[in-house]
UniProtKB/Swiss-Prot annotation:
Native organism: Aminobacterium colombiense (strain DSM 12261 / ALA-1)
HAMAP family according to UniProt: GyrA (MF_01897)
Compartment annotation: Cytoplasm
EC number: 5.6.2.2
Active site: Y127 (o-(5'-phospho-dna)-tyrosine intermediate)
Reactions mediated catalytically: ATP-dependent breakage, passage and rejoining of double-stranded DNA
Gene3D superfamilies registered for this protein in UniProt: 3.30.1360.40, DNA gyrase/topoisomerase IV, subunit A, C-terminal (2.120.10.90), Topoisomerase II, domain 5 (3.90.199.10), Topoisomerase, domain 3 (1.10.268.10)
Protein name, UniProt field: DNA gyrase subunit A
Key words, A-Z: ATP-binding, Cytoplasm, DNA-binding, Isomerase, Nucleotide-binding, Topoisomerase
UniProt cross-references to Pfam families, sorted A to Z: DNA_gyraseA_C, DNA_topoisoIV
Main localization (coarse): cytoplasm
Signal peptide: none
GO annotation terms (biological process): DNA topological change; DNA-templated DNA replication
Lineage: Bacteria, Thermotogati, Synergistota, Synergistia, Synergistales
Motif segment (GyrA-box): 532-538
Length: 817
C-alpha cells in the first residue's frame, strides 16, 4: 500500500523523508547551539549559562560582603531552576568566571583551588566555595526594578532574565569565546578605563561625527589579563573596523646578567590563553631537538609573587638570537584571531567596535529609562499616599470623628472616600496610620518626605523627557564604575617588529607617489624622471585604465610618512615603502592600505617632513580655513583621525605647514589670490569647522595655498600647461575673508589654474597630466612675470589632455612641497 507523505499510519506514526527530517532536526540543533549555548548576547556579553549562574548566585544572596557558599550549592541551584544540563559544564563556566588569568575582570570570587595558568584543573565543586565579586554584582544591579525582559525557565515554573541590566560593558572588558555550528566567536578583553572613555566619547559626539580614529585614540586595543605585548596595530584596526582581525601577542621578557658571565632570558608574562606548562615543554622539546640553539638550562621559578621562567643562555650565544628563535618556534609569540560575533535580537552578527559600543549604550538607555519609569511610578504612588496623610492631619478632628462614628472598617473607608474626598489608597493608608503619626514631629517628617518625593518625580520626568539628561545619567554611572574598578593597562602595544626590520632592509630613496582618480596608489623612484627643459612633453609616468585619471602626486621618501587628507576632513599616515612600486602598472587600490570610510576619498597628499613646523593650515574648496596645532597629528595610523569638520559638499583643497608667524597666499581656480597672516586664524580643535578664509566668486573654488617666504616665488600652473612665477611682493597683506586680487590672466587658451606652489630658484617640479604623462622641470625654466600676466607654455599637451597636478622637489633637502 502506497503511503502519502505526512498522513499518520495507524493514527500514531507520521511518515517523512529521512533527508528532510535530518535537515530540519540539524537546523533546529544548530540554532539551539547558536542562540542558547555558544554565543554571547551583545548587550550583557553573557552566554545563557553564565547569565543563569550569576542570577542564581544573586538569588542565593552571595553578595561580595556575605559568606562564601559551596560551589556545589550554586551549581545545583543553577541546574535545578534554570539550566538543566550537565553539572560539570555549569561548574567549568563558573570556574572560568573566577580565574584572573582567564577574565580581565573576574565576576565570581572563588575560594579554594580554581585552577592555574599551568592548566591544573579546579578542585571538585564539593571542596570549593564562591560568591559574587562587587564588580559582578553590577551585572545584576537594578534587576528588581523592571529594567529587563523576563521569560519562563525550562519547565515554565519560574521566570528568568533574558538579559542582565549590565552596568559595565562586560562583552568588551571580559571578551568571549565559543564555537557554535558553522560559526565561532573570539572577542578579546579590554581595559575598563579605556572602554568607558570610548563610551563617553560616543555619548558626547553626534553619530555622524563619530570617528574610528578617535575611538582608537581612547581605546588603543585589547588588554589581556596575562599582560604581555601586542605587536603592531594593523590587526587591531581591522578588527575594530570589520569585526575580524589577527592580533600578534608576545610574552614579556628581559635579559639578566648573572654571576661568572652568565646570561639569562627571563619570561615574566606570557600571551593570553597560553598554558605555561605547555610553553615550557615546547621550549624544552625544541632545545632537545636542536631547533633552538644556545640554551644551557630551563627552569620555572614562578611563585605567589608572579610568573618567572628562566632560560640560561650559553656564554658564546647572543641572547637576542635565542629570543628570536623562541618567538618563532614556541607559543611565546602567538596570534589571537578576533571574531566579534554576538547575538542581536537572537541573530548572530559580526560587529565593529563602534557597533559593540553603541549596542551597550542603547541597552543602558533602555535599562535606565525603564528603571526611571519604575521609580517614577513608585514615587508617584507614594506621593499620593503621603499627600493623603498630610491632608488627613490638616482635618484630623473630622477624620477621627468619621472613623469613630463608623460601625465597620469598610464603612469608615467609604466615608473617607465619599465625604472627605480621599482616594481608596489614601483612605486605606489613613486607616492603617498609627496614632504616633499625629504628633507634630511626624507631620514634619511627612511634609519633608513629600517634598523629597516631588523633587524625585520632577527629576525622573526630566530624565524620561530629555535624551541628553538620560545620557548624562548613563555617563555619570559609567564614570563611577571607572573610578571604583578601573585599573592600569596590563598589555603593552608596540610597533610590529616586522615594520622595523623591513625599514632597515629598504634603502631610503626619494619617490614619487601617485594616486589615480579611481583610487589606485603607486610609487616610482624619483631618479627615473630625468630633468627636461621647458616645453617638453614628458614621459609616460603611470599606466591608467581608460577613463581613469591621475588625481594627486607627492614626493617623499621610502622611510617617511606620507599624510593623506581626505574629503571628510580626516588625515591618515602611510609609510612610503608600504606603497607598491610599479614602473608601468596601475598600482593597488588605496583601500588596501588605509581605512577609508564609505564615500570618502583622498583629496590632498603631503609628504614633507614636519620638523620645525608648529601648525597645519587647512583651506577648503569653498574658502573655509582653519589652523591646527601639529601635536594633534602625532601617533597617526592608517585608521586616521578627524582634523576638520566640513559642511556638506565641501572638501579640503590644500594643507600647508606653518611656523606660527607666516604669511599665507590663498589662490583660486579663476585667478584670484589673497595674502593674509596666519594669526588671522586662531588655532582650533580637530573637529572645528574653521572660519572664512577667502570670499569666492560664483563657480570659483580654492586650488592652493602657500607660505610666503624670502627667496621664493609662487609658481602657478594652468590646466592647459601655462605657468609662471610671480613675486610675493606684488600681493599686499590683507585681512582674511576678502576676495583678493588677480594672480594670473586666464583665457580659454590657458584654462583654469590647477595649482600654486612656493618654489626656490634651485627647485624642480614634477607635473603629471590627466592621462598619466609626467614631466620633471627645473623651476628656473619658469619665467618671473607680473601677477596680471598670462604666463608661458611649461608643458606641451596632447589634444584632450590637461595638467592634473604637480609636486615641487627641493634639490637641497629632497623634500616635496
Amino acid at each position: 500500500m502506497e503511503e502519502k507523505k505526512g498522513e499518520p499510519l495507524f493514527g500514531k506514526v507520521v511518515p517523512l523523508p529521512l533527508v528532510e527530517e535530518i535537515k530540519h532536526s540539524y537546523l533546529d540543533y544548530a540554532m539551539s547551539v547558536i542562540v542558547g549555548r555558544a554565543l554571547p548576547d551583545a548587550r550583557d556579553g553573557l552566554k545563557p549559562v553564565q547569565r543563569r549562574i550569576l542570577y542564581a548566585m544573586m538569588e542565593l544572596g552571595l553578595r561580595h560582603n556575605t559568606a562564601y557558599k559551596k560551589s556545589a550549592r550554586v551549581v545545583g541551584e543553577t541546574m535545578g531552576k534554570y539550566h538543566p544540563h550537565g553539572d560539570s559544564a555549569i561548574y567549568d563556566t563558573m570556574v572560568r568566571m573566577a580565574q584572573d588569568f582567564s577574565m580581565r575582570y573576574p565576576l565570581v570570587d572563588g575560594q579554594g583551588n580554581f585552577g592555574s595558568i599551568d592548566g591544573d584543573p579546579a578542585a571538585a565543586m564539593r571542596y570549593t566555595e564562591a560568591r559574587l565579586y562587587e564588580i559582578g554584582e553590577l551585572m545584576l544591579a537594578d534587576i528588581d526594578q523592571d529594567t529587563v525582559d523576563w521569560g519562563p525557565n525550562f519547565d515554565e515554573s519560574l521566570q528568568e532574565p533574558l538579559c542582565l541590566p549590565a552596568m559595565l560593558p562586560n562583552l568588551l572588558i571580559n571578551g568571549s569565546s565559543g564555537i557554535a555550528v558553522g560559526m565561532a566567536t573570539n572577542i578579546p578583553p579590554h581595559n575598563l578605563v579605556e572602554v568607558v572613555d570610548a563610551l563617553c566619547y560616543l555619548i558626547d559626539t553626534e553619530p555622524e561625527q563619530v570617528d574610528i580614529g578617535e575611538i582608537l585614540f581612547r581605546m588603543p586595543g585589547p588588554d589581556f589579563p596575562t599582560g604581555g605585548l601586542i605587536l603592531g596595530r594593523d590587526g587591531i584596526i581591522d578588527a575594530y573596523r570589520t569585526g575580524r582581525g589577527k592580533i600578534t601577542m608576545r610574552g614579556r621578557t628581559h635579559i639578566e646578567e648573572g654571576k661568572r658571565g652568565k646570561t639569562f632570558i627571563v619570561i615574566t608574562e606570557i600571551p593570553y590563553m597560553v598554558n605555561k606548562t605547555n610553553l615550557i615543554e615546547t621550549i624544552a622539546k625544541n632545545v632537545q631537538d636542536k631547533t633552538i640553539d644556545g640554551v644551557m638550562d630551563l627552569r620555572d621559578e614562578s611563585d605567589r609573587e608572579g610568573l618567572r621562567i628562566v632560560i640560561e643562555v650559553n656564554r658564546d650565544t647572543d641572547p637576542n638570537l635565542v629570543l628570536r628563535q623562541l618567538y618563532r618556534r614556541t607559543q611565546l609569540q602567538s596570534t589571537f584571531g578576533v571574531i566579534n560575533l554576538a547575538l542581536i535580537d537572537g541573530y548572530p552578527k559580526e560587529l565593529s567596535i563602534e557597533e559593540m559600543l553603541n549596542i551597550f549604550l542603547n541597552h543602558r538607555r533602555s535599562v535606565v529609562r525603564r528603571r526611571t519609569q519604575f521609580r517614577l511610578e513608585k514615587a508617584e504612588a507614594r506621593a499620593h499616599i503621603v499627600e493623603g496623610l498630610v491632608k488627613a492631619l490638616d482635618i484630623i478632628d473630622e477624620v477621627i470623628a468619621l472613623i469613630r462614628g463608623s460601625a465597620t472598617t469598610e464603612e469608615a473607608k467609604e466615608g473617607l472616600i465619599s465625604k472627605l474626598d480621599f482616594s481608596e489608597a489614601q483612605a486605606q493608608a489613613i486607616l492603617e496610620m498609627r496614632l504616633q503619626r499625629l504628633t507634630g514631629l511626624e507631620r514634619e517628617k511627612l511634609e519633608a518626605e513629600l517634598a523629597q518625593l516631588l523633587s524625585d518625580i520632577e527629576r525622573y520626568q526630566t530624565i524620561l523627557g530629555n535624551p541628553k539628561v538620560l545620557d548624562s545619567v548613563i555617563k555619570e554611572e559609567l564614570l563611577e564604575v571607572k573610578r571604583r574598578f578601573g585599573n592600569e593597562r596590563k598589555t603593552e602595544i608596540i610597533d610590529a617588529v616586522e615594520d622595523v626590520s623591513i625599514e632597515d632592509l629598504i634603502p631610503e630613496s626619494d619617490i614619487v607617489v601617485v594616486l589615480s582618480r579611481d583610487g589606485y596608489l603607486r610609487r616610482k623612484d624619483l631618479q627615473e624622471y630625468t630633468l627636461q627643459g621647458r616645453g617638453g612633453k614628458g614621459r609616460k609616468g603611470t599606466a591608467l585604465q581608460e577613463e581613469d585619471e591621475v588625481a594627486l602626486v607627492a614626493v617623499t621618501s621610502t622611510h617617511r610618512d606620507i599624510y593623506l587628507f581626505t574629503s571628510k576632513g580626516r588625515v591618515l599616515a602611510l609609510k612610503g615603502y608600504v606603497i607598491p612600486e610599479s614602473k608601468t602598472g596601475r598600482g593597488k587600490l588605496i583601500n588596501r592600505f588605509v581605512a577609508l570610510e564609505e564615500g570618502e576619498r583622498v583629496v590632498t597628499m603631503h609628504g614633507r617632513a614636519v620638523d620645525g613646523a608648529k601648525y597645519a593650515f587647512f583651506i577648503t574648496l569653498r574658502g573655509t580655513a582653519k589652523r591646527l596645532d601639529l601635536s594633534e597629528l602625532e601617533n597617526l595610523t592608517r585608521a586616521g583621525r578627524r582634523v576638520m569638520g566640513l559642511d556638506e559638499g565641501d572638501e579640503i583643497s590644500q594643507i600647508v605647514l606653518t611656523s606660527g608667524d607666516d604669511h599665507l597666499l590663498i589662490v583660486t581656480a579663476q585667478g584670484q589670490a589673497l595674502r593674509t597672516h596666519e594669526s588671522e586664524f586662531r588655532p582650533m580643535g580637530r573637529t572645528a569647522r574653521g572660519v572664512r578664509g577667502i570670499r569666492l566668486r560664483k563657480n570659483d573654488y580654492v586650488i592652493g595655498c602657500d607660505v610666503v617666504a624670502n627667496g621664493r616665488w609662487p609658481l602657478l600652473l594652468s590646466e592647459n600647461g601655462f605657468g609662471k612665477r610671480t613675486k610675493y611682493d606684488e600681493f599686499s597683506l590683507r585681512h582674511r575673508g576678502g576676495s583678493g586680487v588677480i594672480v594670473m590672466n586666464l583665457s580659454d587658451r590657458t584654462g583654469l589654474i590647477v595649482g600654486c606652489w612656493s618654489v626656490a630658484e634651485g627647485d624642480e617640479i614634477v607635473a603629471i597630466t590627466s592621462r598619466g604623462r609626467m614631466i620633471r622641470l627645473a623651476v628656473s625654466e619658469s619665467p618671473v612675470l607680473g601677477r596680471t600676466a598670462m604666463g608661458s607654455i611649461m608643458m606641451r599637451l596632447d589634444e584632450g589632455d590637461t595638467v592634473a597636478t604637480a609636486s615641487v622637489v627641493s634639490t637641497e633637502d629632497g623634500e616635496d612641497d
